[in-house]
Amino acid sequence: MKTAIFTVVLALAVFAVLSFGWEANEKALSEEFTELIHEKEAASETEARECRYFWGECHDHMPCCDWLVCRCKWPITYNICVWNRTFPEK
């Protein structure tokens, strides 16, 4: 009887240690994933600032992409990027 109780207590202790280790590993993976997402967001933000895309607002300091041109469309009071009837070269 004492052996069975000791075995159960020992098994519970092992499970507690394993679950603690698994939780720590899961938290580390979650932090790595969060850092990766933030890096991807930062990279996409810098790419988006290089040029304005179709129907994006444009000015002298915010140029349109190569295959777009900045035009004022009536009745819109600001300039937007529209297609200049060319295709980007790859």
Curated annotation (Swiss-Prot):
Question: What InterPro entries does UniProt report for this protein, alphabetically?
Answer: Huwentoxin-1
**Per the annotation, which location comes first and is thus the protein's main one?**
secreted
The answer, when asked if Ion transport is one of the entry's keywords, is: no
Q: Which GO terms describe its cellular component?
A: extracellular region
Localisation? Secreted
What does the UniProt record say this protein does?
A: Ion channel inhibitor.
Disulfide bonds, which pairs? 51-65, 58-70, 64-81
Instruction: Please provide the record's free-text comment about the domains of this protein.
Output: The presence of a 'disulfide through disulfide knot' structurally defines this protein as a knottin.
Protein known as:
U7-theraphotoxin-Hhn1d
Q: Where is the signal peptide?
A: 1-19
> So what family is this one in?
Belongs to the neurotoxin 10 (Hwtx-1) family. 13 (Hntx-13) subfamily.
What SUPFAM superfamilies would the database entry show?
A: omega toxin-like
Alphabetically ordered keywords of this record: Disulfide bond, Ion channel impairing toxin, Knottin, Secreted, Signal, Toxin
Tissue expression summary: Expressed by the venom gland.
Can you give the propeptide residue ranges?
20-50
UniProt GO molecular function: ion channel inhibitor activity; toxin activity
What Pfam families does the entry give?
Toxin_12
